[in-house]
Regions:
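Bacterial Sec-dependent signal peptides at the C-terminal "C-region" and cleavage site
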Residues: 3, 7-22
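Structured soluble/peripheral alpha/beta segments that form catalytic or ligand/cofactor-binding pockets
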Residues: 17-363, 367
Length: 369
């Protein structure tokens, strides 16, 4: 699902129109924008390393809520236990913030995501942590989650979205910090989701997992949580086998899920899960997941207004009774409350900066230089 509950929750205050969930998806066309959907987002996360073996994680997300464009960029320096995040918000105007239909071409000021003629995703974002530029080349074809790409969040027709992932991309690029350019390589994950943005009334938040295992397989899981912590019946997932083939849809009943530890934010005071054990017997998977850095919490007062945890994690366990390791990104929303601003407030906030532009702010957590 890739994308932040922040974006979905923003649409709760809009008059939700239901986009088509019957049209056949075609790529690269459907990597572009879908103007009939009130809410849409493009999301990349990944695990990178430099020539010295230092590990990093990144998140770059572009949101479109009707004609309001928001974006988040987060950078995790694992060895320094340093996490930094940035945000942007602008009204959609050429040269300021936009998303093209028919192809991947999304921008929010100088943060951009475009598709090359060869099919690679060209990603650029920057902030106080530094400047990231990546070329992400798909290793596997797009995966359609749910029923032919229709991901249902509840029983109603409006409680659904179109949800597509590329679960493994080869990453090359650079990170420029303090004038020094570091070559990077690694792997990335891409999510694209669009729809009405309506969630069931009993959904308090969600936990989302994107696992990339060293045997070449991937697993996406999301647990939509009620206030009492139980999963709604529309929690689900997808297992992608090592070789290109048919992805296996999963029901939440296929998953054994346990939280193993917790972490409390010193800023928001939210208590987040900080370790998990996940078993999917039908695919022979039994793994533990732990954050690489405890504090990977994003506060977004200048854009979506939602505080959430999204971070790089390590995976270790077994698949088909053989040892397996890997990497993951995990997103945790709703633990710091569901304090979502209305669209009128967001639009006023954007217009208050200039007639066309919104705000761009940043924060850092962990070790500060």
């Amino acid at each position: 699902m890739g994308r932040s509950l922040a974006a979905i929750a923003l649409a709760l205050v809009t008059s939700a129109r239901t986009p088509s969930t019957t049209s056949e998806l075609s790529f690269p066309r459907d990597h572009g924008a879908h103007p009939d959907a009130p809410v849409e987002w493009w999301y990349w996360t990944g695990h990178l390393s430099d020539r010295a073996g230092n590990a990093y994680g990144f998140q770059v997300t572009f949101f479109r809520v009707r004609e309001l464009y928001l974006a988040h960029f987060a950078w995790t320096d694992v060895s320094r236990k340093d996490f930094r995040s940035e945000e942007k918000m602008h009204l959609g105007l050429p040269g300021v913030a936009s998303a093209a239909s028919e192809k991947l071409d999304v921008s929010n000021e100088d943060w951009t995501a475009r598709q090359s003629p060869a099919g690679a995703h060209l990603l650029a974002a920057n902030g106080r942590a530094g400047e990231l530029r990546l070329t992400l080349s798909p290793v596997k074809p797009p995966v359609l989650h749910g029923e032919r790409g229709v991901s249902r969040k509840g029983p109603g027709a409006k409680e659904s979205s179109r949800y597509v992932s590329i679960t493994r991309l080869a990453a090359t690029g650079t990170f420029v910090r303090s004038g020094k350019s570091q070559p990077l390589t690694g792997t990335a994950w891409f999510d694209h989701e669009w729809g009405s943005g309506v969630l069931p009334a009993d959904a308090a938040g969600w936990d989302w997992f994107a696992l990339q295992l060293d045997d070449g397989s991937e697993l996406m899981l999301y647990r939509m949580r009620r206030a009492d912590g139980s999963a709604t019946p529309f929690s689900s997932g997808t297992f992608v086998p090592p070789l290109p083939g048919v992805a296996l849809p999963l029901k939440w009943s296929d998953v054994a899920f346990t939280e193993t530890r917790a972490w409390r934010s010193p800023r928001s005071k939210a208590r987040y899960p900080a370790g998990w054990k996940i078993t999917v017997a039908s695919v022979g998977l039994d793994v533990g997941i732990e954050p690489l850095v405890a504090d990977q919490e994003l506060e977004t007062p200048g854009s979506t207004g939602v505080t959430y945890w999204e971070g790089a994690c390590a995976v270790k366990g077994t698949r088909a009774r053989r040892p397996v390791a890997g990497r993951a990104y995990v997103e945790l929303t709703g633990y710091a409350g569901r304090d979502v601003p209305g669209m009128a407030e967001l639009s006023a906030r954007a217009r208050s900066v200039s007639p066309w532009a919104g705000s761009a702010t940043s924060r850092s957590a962990g070790l500060r230089p």
